[in-house]
Amino acid sequence: MKIGIVGAGNIVPDFLEASKNIEDFEIVSISATENGRERMKKLSEEYGIKNIYTNYEDLLNDDIDVVYIAIPNSLHYEFAKKAIERNKHIILEKPFTTTYREAEELVELAQEYGIMLFEAISNQYLPNYKKTKELISELGDIKIVQLNYSQYSSRYDRFKNGDIAPAFDPKKSGGALMDLNVYNIYYIVGLFGSPQKILYTANIERNIDTSGVLVLDYGSFKCVAVGEKDCKAPLSMNIQGDKGLIKVIGTLNEV
């Protein structure tokens, strides 16, 4: 399987490291903006990537089977759509798209072209999640679920001084909900399905949510998901029932 990577941000080395453990998985190409050329060069030398491009079309012209898209959130739809129309399978970084309608259109288009389209979020495939799902029936009636994903961003100080990275740019669909709280959402919805009601309250700076509290109302119980890029706290999850408690300390994708 031949892979082309779009983007050269912080998540890409993690993807490249993981790819070492997959048989018949060859990273052929990487594409980013001109500003990312030096970083692409470094990655290509370290991981043996043959081709470097600053034009996405050049990457799509390569002999590749799959495109891994790891670029600002606002570009996911556009780049994924082009890849589908070129008959490339897609691994799309989270969040899948900026809007529900964009997600619907990509899924419909992928089905039309017979393309496999994946979102690169791992929570629901890891032992931690599977063990939680296995034990949850022992808790009795669920009453309260609390999740906290707080991570003081390495870009936050620059953001306060006016240097706006994509993760803090409202025009690029950044913010705490899209960047961090999305992990909590996947965990909750994976365990309990869709809520009846949703309320999101956020701390706003420069028109972006730097932290926020998401309340998911399931009728008989409530879930509270906190995502913060402007402060830090121990990462944790509590699922409380009338007969027991599941408590996780650390990121939800840890074992």
Give the location of each predicted region.
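Glycine-rich beta-alpha junction loops
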Residues: 34, 124-125, 148-154, 204-205, ...
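Predominantly a Rossmann-like dinucleotide-binding segment in NAD(P)-dependent oxidoreductases
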Residues: 123-195
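Rossmann-fold dehydrogenase core element
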Residues: 104-122, 141-144
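Hydrophobic residues in well-ordered beta-strands that form the structural core
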Residues: 92-93, 117-119, 248
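Beta-loop-alpha module in the N-terminal Rossmann-like domain of NAD(P)-dependent dehydrogenases
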Residues: 36, 47-109
